[in-house]
C-alpha cells in the first residue's frame, strides 16, 4: 500500500473529520484522481516535440499518456481540427498516491524560488489546479536527455463539497500553501 494512502486511512481521515466538524467518517473528502496535462505548442510544425513530451510524461507519471487533439481549427495558432497538440494522463488508486508522494516530498522542494502554492487556485468545488514550469523538477526525467524545457498542469480532483474541505484535505497531506 502506498505510504500516503495508509497515512490517510490511519491518521488524516480522523484529523480532517475533527477539523471540519463532520459527523461521519464517510463524509471526509478524499482525492479521487490526479490529471497531468502537457500542451505542446509547436507540435503542429515539429512531430518530434510531441514524442519528447510523451517520453517525459511517461517517465513522470509511470504510465503511457493519451495524445490530445485539437477540437477545432485555429488559423492564428496554425492548427487544424484533429491535429495532435499535447498529451495527458489520469492517475487513480495506488499510482495516484505514489505520484502525490513524489510530488510533495521530492519535486516541489526542487522548484526554484518556491514560496508556496496559492490557496486561491481552488475551483469552488474543492479541486485544485497547479502548474509546473519545468519538467526537470521530477527526478525521473534525465536532464541530459531532454530536448527542451516543458511545463505541465496538474489537477487534483477531490470528493470535497467546497474549497474549505479541499484545502483541509491537501493541507493534511502536507501541501505547501502560502
Swiss-Prot record:
GO terms (BP aspect): translation
The keyword Ribosomal protein is annotated on this UniProt entry: yes
Organism superkingdom: Bacteria
Entry protein name: Large ribosomal subunit protein uL5
A molecular function GO annotation: rRNA binding
Function per UniProt: This is one of the proteins that bind and probably mediate the attachment of the 5S RNA into the large ribosomal subunit, where it forms part of the central protuberance. In the 70S ribosome it contacts protein S13 of the 30S subunit (bridge B1b), connecting the 2 subunits; this bridge is implicated in subunit movement. Contacts the P site tRNA; the 5S rRNA and some of its associated proteins might help stabilize positioning of ribosome-bound tRNAs.
InterPro entries the record matches: Ribosomal_uL5 (IPR002132), Ribosomal_uL5_bac-type (IPR020930), Ribosomal_uL5_C (IPR031309), Ribosomal_uL5_CS (IPR020929), Ribosomal_uL5_dom_sf (IPR022803), Ribosomal_uL5_N (IPR031310)
UniProt GO cellular component terms: ribonucleoprotein complex; ribosome
Pfam families: Ribosomal_L5, Ribosomal_L5_C
Assembly notes: Part of the 50S ribosomal subunit; part of the 5S rRNA/L5/L18/L25 subcomplex. Contacts the 5S rRNA and the P site tRNA. Forms a bridge to the 30S subunit in the 70S ribosome.
UniProt family annotation: Belongs to the universal ribosomal protein uL5 family.
Keyword Ligase: no
Source organism per UniProt: Psychrobacter sp. (strain PRwf-1)
Keywords: Ribonucleoprotein, Ribosomal protein, RNA-binding, rRNA-binding, tRNA-binding
SUPFAM superfamilies in the record: RL5-like
Amino acid at each position: 500500500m502506498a505510504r500516503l494512502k495508509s497515512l490517510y486511512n490511519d491518521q488524516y481521515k480522523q484529523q480532517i473529520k475533527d477539523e471540519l466538524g463532520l459527523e461521519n467518517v464517510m463524509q471526509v473528502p478524499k482525492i479521487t484522481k490526479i490529471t497531468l496535462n502537457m500542451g505542446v505548442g509547436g507540435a503542429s510544425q515539429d512531430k518530434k516535440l510531441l514524442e519528447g513530451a510523451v517520453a517525459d510524461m511517461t517517465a513522470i507519471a509511470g504510465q503511457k499518456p493519451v495524445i490530445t487533439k485539437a477540437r477545432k481549427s485555429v488559423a492564428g495558432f496554425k492548427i487544424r481540427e484533429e491535429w495532435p497538440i499535447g498529451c495527458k494522463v489520469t492517475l487513480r488508486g495506488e499510482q495516484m498516491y505514489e505520484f502525490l508522494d513524489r510530488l510533495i516530498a521530492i519535486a516541489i522542494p526542487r522548484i526554484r524560488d518556491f514560496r508556496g502554492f496559492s490557496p486561491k487556485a481552488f475551483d469552488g468545488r474543492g479541486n485544485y489546479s497547479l502548474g509546473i514550469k519545468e519538467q526537470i523538477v521530477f527526478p525521473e526525467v534525465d536532464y541530459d536527455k531532454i530536448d527542451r524545457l516543458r511545463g505541465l498542469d496538474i489537477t487534483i480532483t477531490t470528493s470535497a463539497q467546497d474549497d474549505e474541505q479541499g484545502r483541509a484535505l491537501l493541507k493534511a497531506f502536507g501541501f505547501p500553501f502560502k
